[in-house]
Amino acid sequence: MTDKTSLSYKDAGVDIDAGNALVGRIKGVVKKTRRPEVMGGLGGFGALCALPQKYREPVLVSGTDGVGTKLRLAMDLKRHDTIGIDLVAMCVNDLVVQGAEPLFFLDYYATGKLDVDTASAVISGIAEGCLQSGCSLVGGETAEMPGMYHGEDYDVAGFCVGVVEKSEIIDGSKVSDGDVLIALGSSGPHSNGYSLVRKILEVSGCDPQTTELDGKPLADHLLAPTRIYVKSVLELIEKVDVHAIAHLTGGGFWENIPRVLPDNTQAVIDESSWQWPEVFNWLQTAGNVERHEMYRTFNCGVGMIIALPAPEVDKALALLNANGENTWKIGIIKASDSEQRVVIE
């Protein structure tokens, strides 16, 4: 025998009991997201999911993302209940622009010291995002890593798999001269540009919890969860000939719209067709941000842009509005050999 103290994993900063308590806390909300194709429950070494039988030539579509430094703002303000929705939204919105129906989602939650209440709030938000998008939360990893993160700081990442009929993949190849562009309004900055947001808050000396904008704290505008467009867009795709969809994330208008444009086409955006939500006006003014930089960093009130034939526009707007989306005609596609793929005028 030795007089040395017997060390445990908990002494090293990893509390397995806290991890088990978290699993017990989240089981109920995770179960609500279950799709009929999912086989087995939580706790297996891998999650099993069958393909929906309605697909003749199913193609799997995958995506992974995080929420950037919006997470830092959420931690600073101690508001953890909606950041999980952001995480799901960033993944599933990227899938649906290709016509894919999200099937299942997995998350990765890493922290220096596991706080069960905080982690439970985040994962409950992830489950809510999965409910909004119709996909199952089938598993995840909670990693308590002392020395890797400061205190109870945490990071999250998500991974999603969806499915689309091979013949119905939306890849922008059908976009042509004369197509109309319609916009789907955003709920705010979504999950992009937050390093600039935080810099503006720092330089301006503004407290987002006490500064009011449109009758509510600025923090509410900045932490509004990213809108999930999946169910509205999937119904639209079923009933309307959609040529392309762009999800306006990092890179804003200048970089995301060209991703779905064929060669020799140009998107012409009518800046007078909408008014920026006040949060973007505040950011531009408080940070003295140039117009071009605003459109490169933020969505400026536009979460998605959809290209479709002119005769389909009225039907598309009616369908989207009926599903609660804020939509409008934002521009057109023109034939052009210009290197400038997007024009805002």
Curated annotation (Swiss-Prot):
Any GO BP annotation: adenine biosynthetic process
CDD domains attached to this UniProt entry: PurM
Catalytic function, reaction form: 2-formamido-N(1)-(5-O-phospho-beta-D-ribosyl)acetamidine + ATP = 5-amino-1-(5-phospho-beta-D-ribosyl)imidazole + ADP + phosphate + H(+)
Pathway: Purine metabolism; IMP biosynthesis via de novo pathway; 5-amino-1-(5-phospho-D-ribosyl)imidazole from N(2)-formyl-N(1)-(5-phospho-D-ribosyl)glycinamide: step 2/2
Localization of this protein: Cytoplasm
InterPro entries: PurM-like_C_dom, PurM-like_C_sf, PurM-like_N, PurM-like_N_sf, PurM_cligase
One annotated GO molecular function: ATP binding
Enzyme class: ligase
Alphabetical UniProt keywords: ATP-binding, Cytoplasm, Ligase, Nucleotide-binding, Purine biosynthesis
Protein name according to UniProt: Phosphoribosylformylglycinamidine cyclo-ligase
Species classification: Bacteria, Pseudomonadati, Pseudomonadota, Gammaproteobacteria, Enterobacterales
Record gene name: purM
